[in-house]
């Protein structure tokens, strides 16, 4: 997503040594301790909530904090070009919105921002144009008119299309504009979600949590979220270990993919799970195409995450996914979820991305410290989520998390034309 290219920078006939000081590459970790210094760096530190972390080494902070530190370092470098690589993947939804605002502010100063990002639901609102590369062919269009033949629309694109608007840069802008045009959201008919058989009924005490019994059902995607992602990860791993004691450890799957070819990793996992050799490879080919001959480490970060999710499916009826949307494009992720659903597999997933939870999950457990504080459909627990999904921000107070949950119609001027939604 290129942002506001107000400065021309010629790179022809320049060596890497000449270009290096002109470009700041921002990944998931800073190159050194952030520290405090000039006014620009201090301002970014405040905006990204890094005051208490700026003097700590990146190795001693969470991945979300480290990614924000990397962005602050890149912005304060003064380089005329910022190259952002999947910046939002490690961040929780709350900080994604803050990071996008910081990047947009940098672009307004005239610096060039080139951003490779799969979390388009946030990044697209800050972009001036989008370069989409399909089968080696690049296509650049204005962000306001961009739509993809390969990727599903973002929630804000869907709301804009259904309301007759061009584009919304943020949920706040969408809410304000819908209210100003007297558009009101009313609930769409909710299809009855099929309830598969209960595979296990777990006492949360076994997970070192308090709360009611937790049902794990066949064909259901159960999301676990928390204010601190590590709490959700811990609860998901304990729940999966309780339901399927012989399941494959997700850390081992990532390590296996780094060390060998995809084909060999799939075969090894199939043998360990006493499944016909070739089943995991068949699923990987369905989701990613023919990838067996290459080593896992040769694939992109998002593809490695998808492959680990595929290998986890060898665990049987219950599958554990930890941050399954990390640097994964929406089309591939949706395809994997649909494929797993058709197989009747139960998925337990921990995620830091509340918009992904809203899109994929049938049920959500919200964990706070040592307690399950909410358990239900994504829309019914929206008030307890660490951060509201974008659709919930467009229609606050309505228990709405998906655009499919509502229909937009002209609102009553007697109600002030307020955009709102209500589920029954």
Indicate where each model-derived feature is located.
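Single conserved hydrophobic/aromatic residue that forms the stacking wall/gate
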Residues: 1-7, 11-13
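Q-loop/switch helix immediately C-terminal to the Walker
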Residues: 16-40, 251-280
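Conserved ABC ATPase "signature" region
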Residues: 40-53, 276-292
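ABC ATPase C-loop
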Residues: 75, 216, 312-313
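H-loop/switch region of ABC-family ATPase nucleotide-binding domains
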Residues: 116-118, 351-352
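A short, surface-exposed alpha-helical micro-motif characterized by mixed small hydrophobic
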Residues: 123-125, 357-359
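ABC ATPase nucleotide-binding domains
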Residues: 148-207, 387-424
């Amino acid at each position: 997503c290129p942002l506001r290219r107000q400065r021309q920078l010629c790179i022809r006939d320049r060596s890497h040594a000449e270009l290096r000081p002109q470009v700041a590459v921002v990944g998931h970790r800073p190159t050194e301790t952030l520290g405090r210094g000039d006014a620009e760096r201090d301002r970014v530190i405040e905006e990204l909530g890094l005051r208490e972390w700026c003097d700590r080494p990146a190795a001693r902070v969470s991945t979300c904090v480290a990614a924000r530190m990397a962005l602050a370092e890149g912005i304060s470098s003064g380089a005329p070009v910022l190259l952002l690589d999947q910046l939002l993947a490690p961040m929780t939804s709350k900080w994604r919105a803050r990071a996008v605002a910081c990047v947009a502010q940098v672009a307004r100063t005239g610096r060039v921002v080139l951003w490779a990002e799969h979390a388009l639901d946030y990044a697209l609102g800050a972009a001036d144009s989008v370069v989409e590369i399909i089968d080696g062919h690049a296509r650049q269009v204005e962000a306001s008119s961009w739509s993809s033949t390969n990727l599903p629309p973002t929630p804000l694109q869907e709301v804009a299309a259904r309301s007759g608007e061009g584009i919304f840069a943020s949920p706040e802008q969408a809410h304000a504009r819908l209210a100003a045009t007297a558009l009101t959201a009313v609930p769409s008919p909710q299809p009855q979600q099929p309830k598969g058989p209960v595979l296990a009924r777990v006492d949360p005490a076994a997970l070192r949590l308090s709360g009611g019994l937790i049902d794990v059902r066949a064909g259901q995607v159960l999301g676990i979220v928390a204010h601190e992602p590590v709490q959700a990860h811990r609860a998901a791993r304990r729940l999966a270990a309780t339901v399927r004691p012989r399941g494959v450890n997700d850390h081992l799957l990532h390590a296996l993919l780094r060390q060998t070819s995809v084909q060999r990793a799939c075969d090894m996992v199939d043998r360990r799970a006493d499944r016909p050799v070739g089943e995991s490879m068949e699923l990987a080919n369905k989701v990613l195409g023919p990838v067996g001959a290459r080593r896992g480490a040769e694939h992109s970060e998002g593809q490695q995450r998808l492959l680990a999710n595929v290998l986890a499916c060898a665990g049987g009826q219950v599958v554990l996914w930890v941050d399954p949307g990390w640097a994964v494009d929406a089309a591939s992720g949706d395809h994997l979820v649909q494929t797993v659903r058709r197989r009747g597999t139960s998925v337990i997933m921990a995620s830091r991305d509340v918009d992904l939870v809203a899109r994929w999950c049938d049920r959500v457990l919200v964990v706070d410290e040592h307690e399950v504080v909410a358990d239900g459909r994504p829309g019914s627990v929206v008030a307890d989520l660490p951060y509201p999904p974008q659709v919930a921000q467009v229609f606050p107070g309505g228990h709405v998390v998906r655009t499919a949950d509502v229909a937009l119609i002209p609102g009553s001027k007697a109600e002030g034309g307020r955009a709102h939604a209500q589920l029954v």
